[in-house]
A protein has these predicted regions:
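Conserved small/polar residues in nucleotide/adenosyl-binding loops
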Residues: 349-350
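Long hydrophobic alpha-helical segments that form multi-pass transmembrane helix bundles
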Residues: 142-223
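Alpha-helical transmembrane segments and terminal signal-anchor/GPI-anchor hydrophobic tails
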Residues: 248-296
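Membrane helical hairpin/interfacial module
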Residues: 44-111
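Functional transmembrane helices that form membrane-embedded active or gating regions
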Residues: 3-9, 249-254, 296-325, 343-345
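Specific transmembrane alpha-helix
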Residues: 62-74, 116-129, 216-240, 280-299, ...
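N-terminal signal-anchor module of multipass membrane proteins
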Residues: 1-66
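Membrane-interface helix-boundary motifs at transmembrane edges
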Residues: 80-89, 129-135, 234-245, 299-306
Length: 352
């Protein structure tokens, strides 16, 4: 089965966005990315951090999740076309391999792993992968409706979800000390040494269980995986990007999504702003996919698109390499630049 090149190019593009989003985590920590004002950055780097947060954080990982579901179905279709026996079993083996790699990545390389949750989602989806397109269409619609209701409910909850200034300052000081000067063992066990105020807030709602947190992460991403499968079964990427309801509408909504994502910077931080920001991030992801599809259909032979395509074909390798490079730049067992005022220079170097 012929590869869908626009999907490969989009995957490469999403990897760049993911690296820029993860750059904040590499440099400031999982919750520290939201407290960059406590790192005393110069005005230019601080502004770059805010822009990365609005445009890339929680906007490009959903694209990667959609493409993961898309690729999973394409792989299944390819095996069926080639009359390969027990294709679901082969998908199951691949998911176990990805799960193992995800565990190793999370334990020995970087705590911000996404491979583990992707592998678990794949295990859940395998029994249904042979179902018709209508199944995935309605699962996706119902999934997004449930998520919307979940976060719309937060609009009526004005509870403050922002940790205190003292909690933020303490967290920033402790993680900087460990990531910039601690041993490899201390970095790998930082969750046992430092209380992440953002994670503590989530634990209050979901309970002190990492398994439950992982399942919640899979739940909020599940409609993205099924949307990707729907895109595959409907040949969505091959269709004209000028169609209004399936593409152009979401491009027009990109500015609205950006305003929604920026709400945390011009409004009080509470459950309602968290909900608006999350839903806006998902909307922005779909808008970016549609915009990229439109640009690709007009400039598919452009050298940028071709290079993104090659990057997308090596997405797993590129993702692991990003983690290795990011930790070696910022953690103490590398250059130890965690928390330093160099955000703009690293972003510029990567984009080059």
């Amino acid at each position: 089965m012929k590869r869908v090149e626009v999907a490969d190019s989009l995957r490469g593009f999403s990897l760049i966005g993911i690296f820029l989003a993860n750059l904040l985590i590499f440099q400031f920590g999982l919750s520290g990315q939201e407290y960059i004002s406590y790192f005393h950055l110069n005005p230019v780097n601080y502004s770059v951090g805010i822009l990365i947060n609005i445009i890339f954080v929680h906007s490009f990982l959903p694209i990667f999740a959609i493409l993961f579901g898309f690729s999973m179905d394409k792989l299944y279709q390819s095996m069926k076309t080639k009359n390969i026996k027990r294709p679901k079993l082969k998908l199951f083996r691949r998911s176990l391999g990805l799960l193992t790699l995800g565990f190793l990545h999370a334990i020995f390389i970087w705590e911000g792993d996404i491979l583990t949750s992707y592998a678990i989602a794949m295990l859940i989806l395998i029994p249904f992968i042979s179902f018709k397109i209508k199944f995935f269409k309605w699962v996706t619609i119902i999934g997004f409706i449930l998520l919307s209701l979940l976060f719309i409910g937060s609009f009526f909850d004005s509870t403050n979800t922002e940790p205190s200034s003292h909690e933020k300052a303490t967290y920033v000081s402790e993680v900087t000390q460990i990531y910039a000067h601690g041993s490899f063992h201390e970095i790998q066990n930082i969750d046992n040494k430092v209380k992440d105020p953002g994670l503590e807030m989530i634990k209050k709602d979901l309970g002190d269980s990492y398994g439950l947190l992982l399942l919640f992460s899979i739940f909020i991403n599940f409609p993205l995986f099924t949307l990707g499968i729907y895109f595959s079964k409907s040949n969505w990427f091959e269709k004209n990007a000028k169609q209004f309801w399936s593409c152009k509408l979401f491009i027009y909504m990109i500015p609205i999504a950006l305003i929604g994502k920026s709400i945390m910077y011009w409004s009080n931080h509470n459950n309602s702003t968290d909900g608006i920001s999350f839903l806006s991030g998902t909307l922005l992801s779909i808008g970016i996919i549609c915009l990229f599809k439109k640009v690709y259909q007009s400039h598919r032979q452009n050298w940028i698109m071709q290079n993104l395509k090659y990057m997308g074909k090596m997405s797993l390798t590129m993702y692991i390499m990003q983690s290795i490079i990011g930790t070696l730049i910022f953690y103490s067992y590398g250059l130890g630049l965690f928390g330093k005022d160099i955000l703009l220079s690293v972003s510029y170097t990567h984009l080059r």
